[in-house]
Structure formats: C-alpha cells, structure tokens
Regions:
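Structured, helix-rich domain cores that form ligand/interaction pockets
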Residues: 1-230
Length: 230
C-alpha cells in the first residue's frame, strides 16, 4: 500500500556570522538573489524577507534584526535570526540538505531546530480500515489514545451528513503536537494553492491522477520549542 512521507515545515534558529553581518535583504541582493521584502517584521524580529532559488521560486524565509528590547526576554543577540524553508521547498527531494547547503554557503551558525513538522499521507490504514470511519469510532470512544490527553476535533455539519474532518492531540504549548485530518478536503477548501503536495502524492504512487483525488488523510507530528530549550 503506497504512502507518502514528507517534511511540511522546517525552521531553525541560527546566528549570522560576524564577517557577513548584517545579512539583510541587500546582502542577498548583492549576492545575486531575488529578494521579496515585507514592509513589516514580526513581534520579535524587525526584518522579514524571502529569498528565491535559481528557478525563481520562493525558497528561504529570513527573519532577523531582533526588535529593541526583545533580547531581554528571549535570549537573542543582534546576530540572532530564524530561517524557514517555504512550504514548496519542503517537498523537494532533500529539503534538509538544501537548508544546510544554504546555511553553509552564507556562514550561518546553526543553533538548534525551532520547528519541524513531519507528515504521513495515506488513503487507508494497513489493516484496510477507512480513516473517516476510524475517526468516527475514536470520537465515539471505541478507541483510546495513550498520552496527549488534550483533544480538539473539527467536523462538517450539513443537511445531508455530519462528518468529522480532523482531530488534534496535545496542548498548544506542548513540544509535540499530533493531528489527523483529511488533507484532500483542506487543499480544496484553501483553493488548491499547494500543487506540489498533490505532485508529491503522484510521484510516490499514492494517487494515480493529481487532478482527480481520492480522500487522502494526513497524520502530522509538529515538534517545536523556544530557541532556548531545543
């Protein structure tokens, strides 16, 4: 039975090298990259921009230049930054290598992983059980899950039927969260803005036609931590 396993989010906490500092948007433009700069930053970083790859696709999102006073409660320095692979780049053949090569090329100093999402996409369980029916039985308390006692469920209530579409385990503050949901429905609901996911399903043999999809379900493990604790 075909499966498709991918990274869906890869973000690291790093430091810029003293030799290249400041590694702002102009630094990358001067090195021949196309850069898309956001007019505003984040709560922690005052600068945020996206660097394109050699094919003209968004590749790495950079957040840098900690806001004044942010170091006092986050342990950041003026060299601190976050690097995140954009979602499309996560579905490349070797996203970890791509991130590592980018960091080495520009002398970033790796500190730790900030967030990593691993996803497992499938149509049926190995036993042949239908995921939607399994989820319904779980919510009806026919099964119990060990650990991660915090549970959130989402369903679709219509005149014709009521279907459970997702269940999440773990508190929002947990280092590890688990979610099982209908990925096909999510893609359709968001306007099919991520064709690379359907392409990954096709290339792995999970689906026969990326334009005519069955219900593909996803089990996703999201691991994250503050920059100081992981």
């Amino acid at each position: 039975m075909s499966r498709c396993v991918n990274i869906d989010w890869l973000e690291v906490y790093a430091c810029e090298s003293n030799m290249n500092y400041p590694m702002n948007a102009d630094y990358f433009r001067n090195h021949g990259y196309v850069v898309h700069e956001r007019e505003y930053g984040t709560r922690v970083y005052s600068e945020m921009f996206t660097v394109e790859d050699q094919h003209g696709h968004a590749f790495i999102e950079v957040r840098r230049n900690p806001q004044s006073g942010s170091s006092s409660f986050t342990g950041l320095s003026e060299l601190s930054c976050h690097l995140r692979l954009v979602n499309r780049a996560c579905y490349a053949n070797n996203p970890v290598r791509d991130m590592a090569e980018f960091m080495v090329k520009h002398d970033y100093i790796f500190q730790r992983i900030f967030r990593l999402d691993l996803c497992y996409d499938f149509i049926r369980f190995d036993s042949g059980d239908d995921p939607a029916r399994f989820l319904r039985r779980y919510i009806e308390n026919k099964f119990s899950k060990v650990n991660q006692c915090k549970v959130r469920v989402i369903g679709d209530d219509s005149w014709a039927s009521f279907d459970w579409e997702s269940v999440s385990w773990g508190a929002p503050t947990s280092m590890v969260g688990t979610k099982m949901y209908n990925k096909t429905k999510e893609l359709k609901a968001t306007g099919d803005k991520k064709p690379w996911i359907k392409q990954a399903w096709f290339e792995s043999g999970l689906v026969d036609d990326p334009l005519n999809l069955p219900d593909v379900w996803r089990i996703e493990f999201s691991m994250h931590s503050s920059a100081r604790n992981w």
